[in-house]
A protein has these predicted regions:
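Solvent-exposed loop/turn segments flanking beta-strands in beta-repeat/beta-sandwich domains
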Residues: 105-114
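Short edge beta-strand/loop segments characteristic of extracellular beta-sandwich folds
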Residues: 95-104
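Conserved beta-sheet core of the metallophosphoesterase superfamily
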Residues: 2-90, 109, 118-120
Length: 121
């Protein structure tokens, strides 16, 4: 009974790490896990983590019961949240434009525009 009460009456955000990658996992409308990439990248051997996330840290802002979060890449401004690669960059997907968006969550909308027209999501 207590578990049911906690699961549905309180909004909880679990902060985890150590995987050297970024992910946000929504368990239900009230529970979310934020797994934050490592500031050391891949153990200081590379300036990116295993998922392409740059070295950096997670930021969390709490105001009452509202939680906002972002990922701050080392050496970049706070709004630096993705890298894109032109078609032909990948041998496996030569016709595709590739976007690596870190700290993404299900509420984000990521679109590709050309001359103001949405070309893909």
């Amino acid at each position: 009974m207590l578990r049911r009460f906690i699961n549905y009456c309180y909004e909880t955000h679990f902060l985890t790490g150590h995987l050297h990658s970024n992910s946000n996992i929504v368990f239900n409308d009230h529970q979310m896990e934020h797994n934050t990439a490592a500031v050391c990248g891949i153990w200081w051997h590379a300036d990116v983590c295993i998922d392409g996330t740059p070295q950096g840290y997670g930021g969390y802002e709490v105001d009452g019961n509202q939680v906002k979060w972002y990922y701050k890449s080392a050496g970049h401004p706070k709004d630096y949240q993705f890298r894109s690669y032109a078609a032909g960059t990948s041998k496996e997907f030569p016709k595709d434009i590739i976007a690596n968006v870190w700290n993404w969550d299900k509420n984000w909308k990521v679109e590709w525009l050309e001359n103001g027209k949405v070309m893909g999501t």
